[in-house]
Structures are given as C-alpha cells and as structure tokens.
Amino acid sequence: MPREIITLQVGQCGNQIGMEFWKQLCLEHGISKDGILEDFATQGGDRKDVFFYQADDEHYIPRALLIDLEPRVINSIQNSEYRNLYNHENVFVADHGGGAGNNWASGYHQGEQVEEDIMDMIDREADGSDSLEGFVLCHSIAGGTGSGMGSYLLEALNDRYSKKLVQTYSVFPNQMETSDVVVQPYNSLLTLKRLTLNADCVVVLDNTALNRIAVDRLHIPNPTFAQTNSLVSTVMSASTTTLRYPGYMNNDLVGLVASLIPTPRCHFLMTGYTPLTVERQANAIRKTTVLDVMRRLLQAKNIMVSSYARTKEASQAKYISILNIIQGEVDPTQVHKSLQRIRERKLANFIEWGPASIQVALSRKSPYVQTAHRVSGLMLASHTSIRHLFSKCISQYEKLRKKQAFLDNYRKFPMFADNDLSEFDESREIVQNLVDEYKACESADYIKWGMEDRGKQVSGEGNTSGTVDSRVGAS
C-alpha cells in the first residue's frame, strides 16, 4: 500500500531544488520529461505512486505544489523541457508578482492573505491520495518567500493535518560570504522557530558546507547554484530511495523518521554522501566497498553541515543517531563486518543515554541510471554539533538587533505593528532552548534535563508564554 507524500516547493530556492529533485526522480523511475513511462522501464519493483500519481491519460504527475510570490523561477520551469510534467493547477504565483523583498514578515503576511487558495490546492492533492503519509517542504530560511511563507505554511499544515508527518529540506545560507540579503539573520531566526515547533524532521542543507564540498571534493573553483543544487537533489533522492524501492526496513516516512529522532525537539538532521559522482579522478582508482563507503560517511569532509567540520569542541560532540542508506550490490554479511570494524576503531562517538549503533538500510539502485560506482551511501544523522549552526544564527541576529538595524522593514506588517518585537524575542528564546537541549544531549543524564522547568510549568510557575511550552514533548 503506497503511503503518498506531497511536496511543497516554496520560493526561489525551494522551486530550484525541487526541480532538480523531480528531474532525478524521473531518471530513476524511467519517466520521460513529459511524464510518460519510457518503453525500457519495464522492470517494476519500484513505488512510483509515493511521489507521483497517474492522470487519466497514464501520464505520471508529481504530487507537488509550486509556490512563489514572484514569477521568475516558476516561469523558467514552465518554459523548460519539463513543462508538461507538472499539474498546472498546482502552481501558485502571487497576482502582483512582486515577491516578498527578502522580508520574512512580508512572506508570512502574504501567506495569511492567500492561505485559502493554497490550502485548497493542498486539500485537493490530499483528497487524491489513498493513504497520505505526510508533506515535504523545500525552502530556504534566509530570503522572504521560502522563509516567511514557508513558516506560515508549516503552521497551517500543523493545524489542518496534525496527524501527518511534516519533513523539510531547509537550505541554510552561506555564512562564509557577505550576503546580499542584509536581514538574513532576522529571517533565519524567525524561520528556525517554526522549524523547531512545527516540523517533525528537518534535513539541514548548509550552503557553506555544500560550497566547500564543491570546491574541495569536486574541484569546482566557483560553484554555481545549479551545481550545489545538483548536490542537494542527490541527497534528496537518496534519502527517499527506501520509500521508492522498498525493502524490509525504513520503507515509509514514519519508520525513517522514528529511527533517527529519539527526542522530539532534536529533529534536525545532517547528511553525508559518498562517492560524489563528479569526482572523476577518484573514479579510476577507487574500489567502492561497504566498509569504504561507511567509513567515508563518518569523515568530516563529507558532511554537508559546516558546524560538524569546524567546531573546536568536536571531541565532545556526539551522534544521537545514524542511519546509513547503502545503495548497490551489497552482501548483508559485508555490512555486519563493516559495523564491527567501525565499532572496534571507535570511529563514531555516540551519546551515552541511547543505543550506540549505526542503523543500515539496504536499497536497490535504479536499473535505469548508470553509475560509475558499485556501492554508494547516504548518511542521515542527528549530531549534537549542529547546535553551532543555530548559535551562529543567534549571534548574527544579535549583532543586527543591538543596532536596531532594519527593523522598520518588519514594523510595516501586522505581526510587528505598534513596535511589537516580541516575536523576535520569543524566536530567539526558542532557538536558544534548542541549542541548550543539543548541548544537554552530550551528557549522560540528559533524560533528567529540563525536568525542573517542566515541573514549574505544570504547577503554573515560571514561563507561561504558551508558545514555548505547549509543544514540549510533542513535535
């Protein structure tokens, strides 16, 4: 029984990475650019209907909504060779087409104004599913539409589809370069609040690390957005292979998420992938084995989150959970031996209060895509060092806030009217609590962490702001 997943692509970045994702899925399932099953795609065994549905004329249509407040990226998709792939009823571009001006408050406010139109589209897709499992949101946290409207949609999905899983692929800005979006720290912090409270699982796509990997591993001196988006689509398609080519384990989104997230708040995942297909020099000399792939996945240089490779406290940081999705010709006994070797060499430092084991899901490769490697692997991991990424967001926010810089841009919108900046303060508190919780995960007595505060809240003492506490223990 397929468990369908609806994808929401929001904003410029969300639509660009979403487009690459659908290109990759079409290749892997033998679907043409027009949505027609290719003559050679006869092997079966895959579940196309998790991400696609079949129209009356047998075309495969993505279960996707393309949403933006300005038309440029969606126009380019509608004029591309994949223009006949999408359901045109599932495309939303704001009438004025003026965008959100890189302002979270504008994106959020416009989300409120067009909620009915977008929720109608979501409801229609949901009603067309036999057994809807959840939603995937693709967006950036730094701009205006992906962050602001994306935040509004996360809250709306939580209200209307509270029993469905919400997973996000969230692109974090490059922190090594000066951004042309001066209010990026404000946008990021406000979005992080919603990702903490309203998502069940967040796959962090860190542009800082993606650029580093493109330069260091793929030897691309000045990576373009298209090249980093190609890395993102590789991660997205690999992370969904067990749903599309089901095996014994992790063949639905609930199973995938449950195995990785033992505590509800710590639901931010980092990824690693090897071997990267553009590493041409390595193609000739590397023999990919399960041990080689699993060992490389634990190396900092292959992790797609910058905080992992850059922290001084790396020795204290620990894995909360690891799931390796291994694709290709793999003998399960090789997996067992590889796990033993990794354990003997102590290559992964785990938390003390949970199972210190790497979970492995074996997945078939698409028979329609030729790759140079026998075995490839994706690591999805929860790791306490990710808190440094959030700490960086807080410190960048505080630099701007101290100067009271650019706040007038936000005061124009209802949430911040009458100089009410409590939303900023609340968001900062929630993100700081998240940082503290990841830090607490490193200690053996984490299970007791926060109990005193929760006791106070139950008895009516302490923080009564509601928003912070109402979702403790639930995500």
UniProtKB/Swiss-Prot annotation:
GO biological process, one term: cytoplasmic microtubule organization
One GO CC term on file: cytoplasm
Binding site for GTP: 142-148
Sorted UniProt keywords: Cytoplasm, Cytoskeleton, GTP-binding, Microtubule, Nucleotide-binding
Gene Ontology molecular functions: GTP binding; microtubule nucleator activity
Keyword GTP-binding in record: yes
Region (Disordered): 455-475
The UniProt record lists the keyword Cytoplasm: yes
Annotated compartments: Cytoplasm, Cytoskeleton, Microtubule organizing center
Family annotation (Pfam families): Tubulin, Tubulin_C
Superkingdom, natural source: Eukaryota
Role according to the record: Tubulin is the major constituent of microtubules. The gamma chain is found at microtubule organizing centers (MTOC) such as the spindle poles, suggesting that it is involved in the minus-end nucleation of microtubule assembly.
Family assignment from sequence similarity: Belongs to the tubulin family.
Record protein name field: Tubulin gamma chain
Organism, scientific name: Physcomitrium patens
Chain's gene name: TUBG1
